[in-house]
């Protein structure tokens, strides 16, 4: 065979046909099932990622809240309390409620909010144990004429002294209010009981110092009273002497020395 013929035969040779593999009846179903499994795995992963993101955001929020200062938390608490009070007020607008009941309700709401805020601030601290150690209790003074008008003395800065100057200020505020009643019959008995209650939480050494200070005051009072008594006696004696001299000097001799009734023979 000539070379040209060989070339023609090589060019006429066609590539072998591609034989398509026949799919089995269940092969398509397996592909669908694999797709579903992949979709389920993807959904689970998305849920896990969402939960992880939520947990991370919550942790970041808690960390940010812990970093806030006490003043910031108190301010947020006040804003929340005002918001709750306004919401309660709007809800009760249609109800038949007088002004006194409204104020009482708002006060209860505020108190509940304060308690919740205290729990948020102190967390798992045993508040009852702290109270037993002498933590101040709420001292609410209300007006007998208007019970809705009340003041919590324990919340006032004056009654939360910590420094020497603050205690001095508390003293200068209370003493004039209390000693103004010193002339009343029950004041002395009240002062005794008040003093005992006042030093009840102190140790014996501090109580002894206070007792010594009271003894010093008692001795000073005794000296003052004795000096006053001596001065009073001297003044009284001087007044009595002056009165006697004045009475003696001012006595008038009313005897009549006229010659009426006397005869010449009377001198014989």
Swiss-Prot record:
Compartments where located: Cytoplasm
Give the GO molecular function terms. Answer: translation initiation factor activity
Q: Where is the composition biased (Acidic residues)?
A: 26-44, 87-99
Q: Which Pfam families match?
A: eIF3_subunit (PF08597)
Which GO biological process entries does UniProt record here? formation of cytoplasmic translation initiation complex
Q: Which GO terms describe its cellular component?
A: eukaryotic 43S preinitiation complex; eukaryotic 48S preinitiation complex; eukaryotic translation initiation factor 3 complex
The chain's coiled-coil residues are 40-95
What is the predominant subcellular site recorded for this chain?
cytoplasm
Spell out the Basic and acidic residues composition-biased ranges.
Answer: 45-65, 72-86, 100-117, 220-232
Renumbered residue ranges of the record's region Disordered:
1-117, 219-242
Alphabetized, the UniProt keywords read: Coiled coil, Cytoplasm, Initiation factor, Protein biosynthesis
Q: Which InterPro entries match?
A: eIF3-like_dom_sf, eIF3j
What is its quaternary makeup?
A: Component of the eukaryotic translation initiation factor 3 (eIF-3) complex.
Q: What does this protein do?
A: Component of the eukaryotic translation initiation factor 3 (eIF-3) complex, which is involved in protein synthesis of a specialized repertoire of mRNAs and, together with other initiation factors, stimulates binding of mRNA and methionyl-tRNAi to the 40S ribosome. The eIF-3 complex specifically targets and initiates translation of a subset of mRNAs involved in cell proliferation.
* Similarity comment text for this entry: Belongs to the eIF-3 subunit J family.
Put simply, this protein is called Eukaryotic translation initiation factor 3 subunit J
Q: Which organism is it from?
A: Aspergillus clavatus (strain ATCC 1007 / CBS 513.65 / DSM 816 / NCTC 3887 / NRRL 1 / QM 1276 / 107)
Per UniProt, what is the name of the gene that codes for the protein in this document? hcr1
């Amino acid at each position: 065979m000539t070379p040209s013929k060989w070339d023609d035969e090589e060019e006429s040779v066609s590539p072998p046909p591609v034989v398509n593999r026949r799919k089995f009846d269940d092969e398509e179903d397996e592909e669908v099932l694999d797709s579903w499994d992949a979709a389920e795995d993807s959904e689970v992963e998305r849920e896990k990622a969402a939960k992880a993101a939520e947990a991370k955001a919550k942790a970041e929020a808690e960390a940010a809240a812990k970093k806030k200062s006490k003043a910031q938390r108190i301010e947020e608490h006040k804003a929340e309390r005002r918001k709750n009070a306004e919401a309660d007020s709007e809800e009760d607008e249609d109800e038949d409620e007088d002004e006194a009941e409204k104020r009482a309700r708002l006060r209860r709401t505020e108190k509940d909010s304060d308690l919740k805020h205290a729990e948020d601030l102190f967390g798992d601290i045993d508040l009852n144990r702290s109270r037993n150690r002498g933590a101040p209790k709420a001292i609410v003074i209300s007006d007998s004429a208007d019970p809705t008008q009340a003041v919590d003395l324990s919340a006032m800065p004056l009654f939360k002294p910590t420094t020497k100057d603050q205690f001095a200020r508390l003293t200068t505020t209370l003493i004039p209010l209390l000693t103004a009643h010193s002339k009343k019959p029950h004041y002395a008995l009240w002062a005794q009981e008040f003093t005992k209650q006042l030093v009840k939480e102190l140790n014996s050494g501090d109580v002894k110092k206070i007792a010594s200070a009271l003894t010093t005051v008692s001795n000073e009072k005794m000296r003052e009273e004795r000096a006053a008594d001596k001065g009073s006696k001297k003044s009284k004696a001087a007044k009595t002497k002056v009165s006697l001299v004045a009475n003696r000097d001012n006595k008038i001799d009313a005897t009549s020395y006229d010659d009426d009734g006397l005869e010449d023979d009377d001198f014989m």
